[in-house]
């Protein structure tokens, strides 16, 4: 898991060959003005979801992980808290191959605060519980990057 500001995202391009395309896309795009929906950047290897999510309490937020994709999550409209638990301490649960998604019961071990202008990267080894906020809605951008 990585937490940093958007201006530093370029420092992480060596971690995945597709990260440089994410940096280029962000430089060319006003993320805040995009409508909800999916934008394909490089087939199913790299795409971005623009979404408005319902704000949740820590108890409502579900821990999740992905096997095939890395999440780069960027809050746009408001601060978002995200739970984190290393996947190796989570129980083995059913994996949805079609959605590349595993859910887990219980609360996260730790919580990070991600402000607009920041990002959080969650790798397959990172259990994460997004969308924790006192706001009823969170506008956010999620880049899905093939691992």
Give each language-model segment a name:
Residues 1-40:
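Long, hydrophobic N-terminal alpha-helical segment
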Residues 38-57, 63, 67-76:
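A short glycine-rich, His/Asp/Glu-containing loop-to-beta-strand
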Residues 68-70, 74-82, 88-90, 97-102:
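Glycine- and acidic-residue-biased ligand/ion/polar-headgroup-sensing regions
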Residues 82-83, 112, 127-134:
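Short beta-strand His + acidic residue motifs that chelate non-heme Fe in jelly-roll/DSBH
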Residues 119-121, 136-147:
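A short hydrophobic beta-strand segment most commonly corresponding to one strand
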């Amino acid at each position: 898991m990585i937490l940093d500001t958007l201006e530093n995202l370029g420092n992480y391009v060596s971690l995945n060959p597709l990260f440089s395309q994410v940096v280029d896309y962000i430089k060319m795009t006003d993320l805040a003005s995009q409508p909800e929906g999916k934008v394909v950047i490089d087939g199913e290897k790299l795409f971005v979801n623009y979404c408005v999510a319902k704000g949740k309490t820590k108890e409502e937020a579900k821990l999740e992980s992905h096997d095939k994709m890395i999440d780069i999550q960027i809050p746009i409209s408001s601060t978002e808290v995200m739970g984190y638990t290393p996947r190796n301490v989570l129980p083995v649960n059913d994996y949805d191959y079609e959605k590349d998604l595993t859910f887990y019961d219980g609360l996260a071990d730790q919580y990070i605060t991600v402000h607009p202008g920041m990002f959080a990267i969650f790798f397959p080894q990172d259990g994460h519980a997004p969308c924790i906020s006192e706001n009823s809605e969170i506008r956010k951008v999620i880049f899905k990057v093939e691992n």
